[in-house]
Amino acid sequence: MEKSLFVFISGSSGVGKNTVISKLMEKNENIEFLRSHTSRPPRVDDKKNVYYFVPSNADFEKLINDGDILEFDYFSDHYYGISIAEIKSQAQKGKIIIKDLTVLGVSNVKELMRNQLEIVSVFLTADKAVLKDRLIKRKTDKAEIKKRLKEYKHEQNQMLSYEYVVYNNDLDKTIAKMEAIINSSTNHLPILALQSCQQAHDKKIEKYAAKLNKGKSLKPIKVVALDGRIYLIEGINEYLAHLKTGKHINLIFTENYKNIKPEENNLKEFEKLTNLYRK
């Protein structure tokens, strides 16, 4: 049976995680939401198939102590978490399973289930001014807005641990990027290149490979989404160093590029390069 792809999304409050998830689920019936367990009482406005309700905090704590909960958070006097049973159940459906998680939650799931699940992590962010405007429109308390904007810089520093970074300044463009990520991940499609392969240099590749092998992070590699595929536009040497070492890199979607069509010769040359350096 085909395994499911788990797409975990993190980001600041107000960045639009729930909106993006809802839109993706509307457009693709193969995408399902990963249900959480919670100890808070049900609400009238709760959406269907979002939570499994646990009677009390004590009952939830028993699940934790019994090792049934993979990842959890305590918020507003109640527990929220994902059960191992739910993860394993969804893993065999051959679906795209999507869920918003905290940075710590994504880290925990990766650490504990990396060898059992196919996981892609996305850090959803937005320009600070856009985020502030959204919080104001949501009638968020001024003190809370100030607090969240203060946390913005710290949250931005977390994005390097994710496979992809997507700026949600425009919803339609964000959905196109997310669809490219999902398409590439489910179909195991390689990243293609708009950047000229003539800019690939052995010495630079070796330098970046040495950094990665020492556990150092490289600057995010810039990519774009075109027709459901992911194209590299800057960072070819860093990307090839990643293939050579098998170490983690960070791909960030950008819109600051000239709208040029991929050149067939460059795509073929890039395929040769990736095959040469792929570990």
Regions found by a protein language model. Give the residues of each.
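Hydrophobic anchor at the beta1->P-loop junction of P-loop NTPases
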Residues: 9
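P-loop (Walker A) phosphate-binding loop of NTP-binding proteins
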Residues: 12
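Walker A/P-loop
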Residues: 18
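ATP-dependent small-molecule kinase phosphotransfer cores
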Residues: 38-97, 103
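Conserved phosphate-donor/acceptor-positioning beta-strand/loop module used by diverse small-molecule
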Residues: 98-103, 115-138
